Amino acid sequence: MDFEKDVIRTVTFKLIPALVILYLVAYIDRAAVGFAHLHMGADVGIGDAAYGLGAGLFFIGYFLFEVPSNLLLDKFGARKWFTRILLTWGLITMAMALIQGPKSFYLLRFLLGVAEAGFFPGVLYLITQWYPVRHRGKIMGMFVLSQPIAMMIAGPLAGLLLGMDGIANLHGWQWLFVAVGLPAVLLALPTFLWLPDNIDKVKWLSIEQKQWLKNELVKDEAEYDQTRHANPLHALKDKRVLLLALYYLPVTLSIYGLNLWLPTIIKQFGGGSDIQIGFLSSIPYIFGIIGLLIIPRSTDRLNDRYGHLSFLYALGACAMFLSGWLNSPVMQLAALAVVAFCLFSSTAVFWTLPGRFLTGASAAAGIALINSVGNLGGYVGPFGIGLLKEYTGNMAAGLYFLSIVMLFGLILTYIVYAKLERQKTQTVNIQKPL
């Protein structure tokens, strides 16, 4: 057991902090557009519906190029492909400062999705290549921690950058895009020099440790009936993969609907400066961090993914409804904090599921498809809320819509359990000799 702990601790120390930093940069980048919208719309003529459409177009580009990107990652290796992703997404984010109107906004948001496609599922794929199944819940929780941390940082940071309005004849939102895009460009070279492609190429594990880790991954393939398709594209037709892609939709639709509109929701509480809005926007994400520190470890300890997911969806749906129904800004913010607790921790738990039945290049293709289809929710959520806000004049209808979406996720939890886990258990029982 001490040997196993040493190996997992070493791998985690060498990989996870740097991957968390990279995803932190990516998620701050994604959050920037929500804060830029507070002023950009008036400067270049982008209304609520146009903003919702443009914010969502990122995910159309992401959807179309996710699977090809992850297959190229498997072909060229994580080191080269992650370097490419960082360079292109950083440069395109900085180019967002040049937006002149809705058309250029739409184009650059779409291109940003194309550029970033493959990063998040690429990291998930790496986790399946480095960690046995029994350790993935905790590790996934550690990695997904970068999401709420990024949102917590993004609020105050955006408030400060928006305050630079007029410096060097640039608007504050232009400074915001330049500032959040630059770190990705600067991290490209260190990533190329540091990130290993596979277990065999690292020098920080002994031969004995490498062999143990590879043996454990092989054991997982047998124990969890993992599939390694002869052609990785066949994973795209696997019914289990398609079901999980559908199951991921409620998570992404809710989380991006909330993330990209939260500054506007906070502003409707009663105004306030950009810095005040930024700091208030960070509060729900503190609870997202708490959820990620508690829930994934609990799922590993109890070996119960679906019970936890059911609880999170049910609680999140109730809290989302209350955030639109309540009139007190304090209570609304408290309800949104509960929503963040549920959404971020459910994301970490969800991503332990595909690796239970996919491995190798099939995992790269399958995870990419799940993420790309699921991330269509990132298009529907912001766009749908934008339309509802423009029609009703407030955010309540959009929050009720997200509450219904989370109830749909609760229903899907039972369907996924019945189709994947219970069916597998019955098969195992039938195969046991009498």
From Swiss-Prot:
InterPro entries: MFS (IPR011701), MFS_dom (IPR020846), MFS_trans_sf (IPR036259). It is a multi-pass membrane protein. Keywords: Antibiotic resistance, Cell inner membrane, Cell membrane, Membrane, Transmembrane, Transmembrane helix, Transport. The chain crosses the membrane at residues 15-35, 45-65, 85-105, 110-130, 142-162, 175-195, 241-261, 275-295, 306-326, 333-353, 367-387, 396-416. Disruption phenotype: Inactivation of the gene causes a significant reduction in the surface-associated motility and virulence. Mutant has 2- to 4-fold higher susceptibility to novobiocin and trimethoprim, and 8- to 32-fold higher susceptibility to the quinolone-type antibiotics nalidixic acid, levofloxacin and ciprofloxacin. Mutation does not affect susceptibility to beta-lactams, aminoglycosides, macrolides and polymyxins. PROSITE patterns: MFS. It is found in: Cell inner membrane. GO terms for biological process: response to antibiotic. One of its GO terms (molecular function) is transmembrane transporter activity. Pfam families: MFS_1. Gene3D superfamilies: MFS general substrate transporter like domains. One of its GO terms (cellular component) is plasma membrane. Efflux pump that mediates resistance to quinolone-type antibiotics. Belongs to the major facilitator superfamily. This is Quinolone resistance transporter. It comes from Acinetobacter baumannii. The gene is abaQ.
